[in-house]
Amino acid sequence: MRAARCSIIRGAAGLRMASSVMSEMKEQMLKRSKVEKQTISELRKKHGDVKLSDASIDAAYCGMRGITGLVYEPSLLDPVEGIRFRNRTIPECQEVLPKAPNGCETLPEAMFWLLMTGEVPTAEQARALNAELHRRADPVAIAAAQKAIAALPASTHPMTAFSVGVLALQTYSKFAAAYATGKSNKTTYWEYALEDSLDMLARTPAVAAMIYNRVTKGRAEVAASSNSELDWAANFSNMLGFKDNEFWECMRLYLSIHVDHEGGNVSAHTTTLVASALSDPYLAFSAGLNGLAGPLHGLANQEVLKYLLSMQDRVKADGVNVCDEAALEVALTKYTWELLNSGQVVPGYGHAVLRKVDPRYTCLRNFCLRHHFEDDLFKLINIIYKIMPGILTEHGKTKNPYPNVDAHSGVLLQHYGLTEQDYYTVLFGLSRQMGVMAGVVWDRLQGRPLERPKSITTEMLAKKYLCTPR
């Protein structure tokens, strides 16, 4: 790696050195922003009154599902293709983004660069960004988070602990400090938001590792010290206590494909909404994590694993040999119809937007096939993957009978010995910060205002459309 060129700049915390990789990142962002500013101006001037969608009464009562009313730059979800990160599909990202030496999986820090700048980083830029993140992993800030987490009751859910840990890091927010002292303004908010985003990305792996070791060993500490020779995902895995390179590859994949899923989901929209009030990135992301912790959002992967384990128990209880695919298919078909006929749903199948197999599911499945998984759980999901679309189509109560990413993610983690189900959403959140922080920074760069939609009451609607006083 070439020697870093540095320049002196003044931030909220005083003088600091700006690395060349930061200069390159900002340069790419400003270049893109200049073009987009002209595009936005032209769109609003010529087509500002064009309706993107209709907000019906039905939609207002049904979670605003299907209403297009947000601009969110990092990613776009296509019902057929799946997620596009800066207009690149997951297979395209896997092809062009830098990987670890002798590795096959995308480096999450390279994905972060893509989300933040819209450009594919060089291998050198990815390495330099990783070095920048290591430099920003301030032990004093991390110790503050450790103290806060250690003070929580032992029974605290890992996602609660993660949210608390992020709030503890907020004490060191450069965005908040600059705003409070009058050093920032509308033209510089984005730079302070970027500073906080990078600091948070640098420090949250240690926080997440502490939470894992608190769950498994009862101590809020990392299993191994941070290693500046390792990439972001490998270093995190090492701090968890996992030394196997294959697991590191698994984490690179997991953390790179969960980074974003456009701006309308609960965690992304919550983060965006809170940040629109000029709350700093830590406050905004902590709010997003609280949304991610909900059973209908990030906890879905736990629900899938519970379902799979219950299926595994039934198979064993009925004496079905998991190596006998024909017998396993008959048994799982029977169990599935019993589940559906009881009014329940199959966890991990269906999606609010997608109408095909989630490409993230395909990535995880292909990883298992490449690494020759022979687990009973993998054999189960293989058969479920084969039979479920047909069963759900015949059942007729879903628009999408195909699997989403949650249908597979827990199986990988179980395979490598990360079996603590309550912890899985922390991994999701650790990854998701990359996308939502890119969204926050770009909102500030584009000068996006406070989000403030209008609400109505049932009484008002009844008076207007039913002509009945209430």
UniProtKB/Swiss-Prot annotation:
Its EC number is 2.3.3.16. Pathway: Carbohydrate metabolism; tricarboxylic acid cycle; isocitrate from oxaloacetate: step 1/2. Pfam families: Citrate_synt. GO terms for cellular component: mitochondrial matrix. It is found in: Mitochondrion matrix. It catalyses: oxaloacetate + acetyl-CoA + H2O = citrate + CoA + H(+). GO terms for biological process: carbohydrate metabolic process; tricarboxylic acid cycle. Keywords: Mitochondrion, Transferase, Transit peptide, Tricarboxylic acid cycle. It is an enzyme of class 2 (transferase). GO terms for molecular function: citrate (Si)-synthase activity. The active site is at 297, 351, 406. It comes from the Eukaryota. Belongs to the citrate synthase family. Citrate synthase is found in nearly all cells capable of oxidative metabolism. Homodimer. This is Probable citrate synthase, mitochondrial. It comes from Leishmania braziliensis.
